[in-house]
Amino acid sequence: GANSAAHIAILELNKQYGLNIEPVHYRGEAPMWTGLMEGTLDAAMGSYTAAQPVLQSNLGVPFAVHSKKVDALPKVKTLPEQGATSKFFTVSGFTGWSLPKATPQPIVDRLAQLCVAANSDPKVKEVLATFVLEPTLGFKETNALYQHELPIWMESAKSLGLEPV
């Protein structure tokens, strides 16, 4: 979608390499991956999980991952390993839990502790591995990651002329 990690990544690649890849914004990944399989798209960028129909049918080949190697795709290099230099290619693109701002801090802390504790559960480990997801971080770790990466997102968005949607 507009201003998503995939959108910014495409624009950063265009900027660095003088390309003219046109981002096409879909309402979800399923129709995008379907478009790739049908041949109406030349390339697509999204999550490993949603790409499974493409990967399993051999109708698409992964050629890059964002900033961190993916165990399920050990031969696929990251964009920085392939020469991409934007700071944006160092962000993790994490998914986080959110609560209303008025939630008392002890409740936030307790829920964060429970989420981190769940990382040890064998069923949770299996789900994380299946969907190629990282274990949940604690509240302080998540906040530190957010504070570190937000300026990078904002710098990329500003330099690319993106406006909030």
Protein language model regions, located:
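Conserved, function-defining micro-sites of small-solute handling proteins
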Residues: 1-165
